[in-house]
């Protein structure tokens, strides 16, 4: 049983690595507010379809 078999073999149920973007699957820069669960890059590209308006 080598290192590559053991690394990330146990599922994560808590912490930042357990939550993924619902669009692309990325775990970095995640926006969880209002239950979006979307990374910031996907949020910027889909904000208008979701219903967010940029005022400035």
Curated annotation (Swiss-Prot):
It comes from the Eukaryota. Binds 1 zinc ion per subunit. Keywords: Metal-binding, Ribonucleoprotein, Ribosomal protein, Zinc. Zn(2+) binds at residues 21, 24, 39, 42. GO terms for cellular component: cytosol; cytosolic small ribosomal subunit; plasma membrane. GO terms for molecular function: structural constituent of ribosome; zinc ion binding. Its cofactor is Zn(2+). GO terms for biological process: translation. Belongs to the universal ribosomal protein uS14 family. PANTHER family: 40S RIBOSOMAL PROTEIN S29, SMALL RIBOSOMAL SUBUNIT PROTEIN US14Z_US14Y_US14X. This is Small ribosomal subunit protein uS14z/uS14y/uS14x. The lineage of its organism: Eukaryota, Viridiplantae, Streptophyta, Embryophyta, Tracheophyta. The gene is RPS29A.
């Amino acid at each position: 049983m080598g290192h590559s078999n053991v690394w990330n073999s146990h599922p994560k149920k808590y912490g930042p690595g357990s939550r993924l973007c619902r669009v692309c699957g990325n775990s970095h820069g995640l926006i969880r507010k209002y239950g979006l669960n979307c990374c910031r890059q996907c949020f910027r590209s889909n904000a208008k379809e979701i219903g967010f308006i940029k005022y400035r």
